[in-house]
């Protein structure tokens, strides 16, 4: 059995996943990092990280991942960091059922499948940590993010319910809720909105053009955006603290959003959000 604590981290091609995989490896963890494409393996393997192929939309790859990790570690899985996701932008009325379903396949159903597959290993050990990289948009909705909002709100519900159900088992569940973080997330969102939204024939065409200008870099820059190390700080706490928190809200805008949601009347709060989307 592996002597080092074992963690599975998903979505490690770039951004938060890649950074956290490297940081945990340097901090003494045995890291199993997942990517969807073989060409993304080399950079991680060069750091001494064990890399496996996994796609949340393909159940057979999820099952194979868990089987392979268990085989290599003698059945030890100490932690899971669900991180791989993407954001489908677009007005709710412009999101087809097929596009919405794909958003949930990646951001919710795949996460649920993987989580449920590692829990039996953690139960046998009498301990474990499950951390979901959610989003501030799982707590505070933004316009033109309905599909992504919905997937993260669903994840919040599943995650906190699971935390409550696992109380006393030695398995702790935490949700990390970042605001703007430097990553390839925006570039991926841009690709999906162009592929799945009929922009020119939408009642929201003018707003789409404004948002595309921002996503493509000709709009205002978000001065509150942090690097992935901000996520790692809270991930490390969630993995190692005796009493990990249920929620870790990251970045100033995210913390402000949570506070204002608590303090303001709902109608005023939602009107205020229109100024920041």
Task: Describe each model-derived feature in a short phrase.
Residues 168-219:
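C-terminal beta-strand-loop-alpha-helix "lid" module of Rossmann-like NAD(P)-dependent dehydrogenases
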Residues 115, 151-154:
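Active-site helix of classical SDR
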Residues 46-60:
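Rossmann-fold cofactor-recognition segment
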Residues 91-92, 99-101:
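Substrate-binding pocket helix/loop in short-chain dehydrogenase/reductase
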Residues 135:
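Residue(s) in the substrate-gating loop at a strand-loop-helix junction
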Residues 115-116, 160:
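A short, exposed helix-loop element centered on a Lys and neighboring polar residues
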Residues 13-14:
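Conserved glycine-rich cofactor-binding loop
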């Amino acid at each position: 059995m592996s002597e080092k604590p074992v963690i599975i981290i998903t979505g490690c091609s770039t951004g938060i996943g890649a950074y956290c995989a490297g940081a945990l490896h340097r901090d003494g963890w045995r890291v199993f990092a997942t990517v969807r494409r073989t060409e993304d393996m080399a950079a991680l393997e060069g750091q001494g990280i064990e890399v496996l192929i996994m796609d949340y939309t393909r159940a057979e790859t999820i099952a194979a991942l868990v089987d392979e990790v268990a085989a290599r570690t003698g059945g030890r899985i100490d932690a899971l960091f669900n991180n791989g996701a993407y954001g489908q932008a677009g007005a709710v009325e412009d999101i087809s059922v097929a596009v919405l379903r794909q958003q949930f396949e990646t951001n919710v159903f795949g996460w649920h499948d993987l989580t449920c597959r590692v829990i039996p290993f953690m139960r046998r050990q009498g301990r474990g940590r499950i951390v979901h990289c959610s989003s501030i948009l799982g707590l505070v909705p933004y316009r033109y993010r309905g599909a992504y909002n919905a997937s993260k709100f669903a994840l919040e519900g599943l995650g906190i319910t699971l935390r409550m159900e696992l109380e006393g088992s030695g398995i702790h569940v935490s949700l990390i809720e970042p605001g703007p973080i430097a990553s390839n997330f925006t570039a991926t969102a841009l690709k999906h909105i162009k592929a799945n939204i009929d922009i020119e024939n939408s009642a929201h065409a003018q707003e789409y053009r404004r948002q595309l200008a921002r996503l493509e870099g000709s709009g205002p820059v978000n001065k509150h955006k942090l690097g992935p190390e901000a996520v790692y700080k809270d991930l490390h706490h969630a993995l190692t603290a005796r009493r990990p928190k249920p929620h870790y809200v990251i970045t100033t805008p995210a913390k402000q959003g949570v506070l204002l949601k608590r303090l303001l009347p709902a109608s005023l709060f939602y009107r205020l959000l229109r100024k920041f989307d």
